[in-house]
């Protein structure tokens, strides 16, 4: 990201003035892919084990922990309430589930399967806009393709929109047409296509044109 120095309060001498305030060792993790989200004095972050943490931004102390089904790779998306404090949290996990939590307590409000394909995964952050949440669909089918008896490949990347209050699907847009059988390898395992075109990152909303 490029930005003119005069537009940025973070000037060149600033790093020399920074001091470590606190650290947090995430249990059971040897990597971190989820970027922290800060709101209302709280740091929200997912982890390799599937745990989602709410940490005090000043002290690093844990307010609460929620355990998802699998690794959370995207950032936690925060919906603010009327008081401009975090009200709800939205995120997806590596097994393709999407979640809505109560920001104050970490209580589960709803949990939904993003797509019926068994190898669906979610790596990008969810995007909240008006009454909907937009979810990018990706897959681990490339791993399944290693197996000689796996009929590859049928997954289709895309984006879905769900109702933020209920988690019910409003619409679903796939990147490619539905896969069809193409040919049989060795007369036993069928090959399928087209497939793929996963969406790894977060969708972008054009508020002016509602796109």
Regions found by a protein language model. Name each.
Residues 25-26, 113-116, 172-193:
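Surface-exposed loop and turn segments in beta-propeller and other repeat-based domains
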Residues 1, 29-51, 70-98, 118-151, ...:
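Repeat-blade elements of multi-bladed beta-propeller folds
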Residues 10-16, 47-60, 67-68:
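Beta-propeller domains
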Residues 19-21, 61-64, 107-111, 170-171:
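A structural motif specific to WD40 beta-propellers
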Residues 1-21:
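Blade/loop signatures of beta-propeller domains
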Residues 56-59, 102-105, 163-166:
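Short loop/turn segments that connect beta-strands within beta-propeller blades
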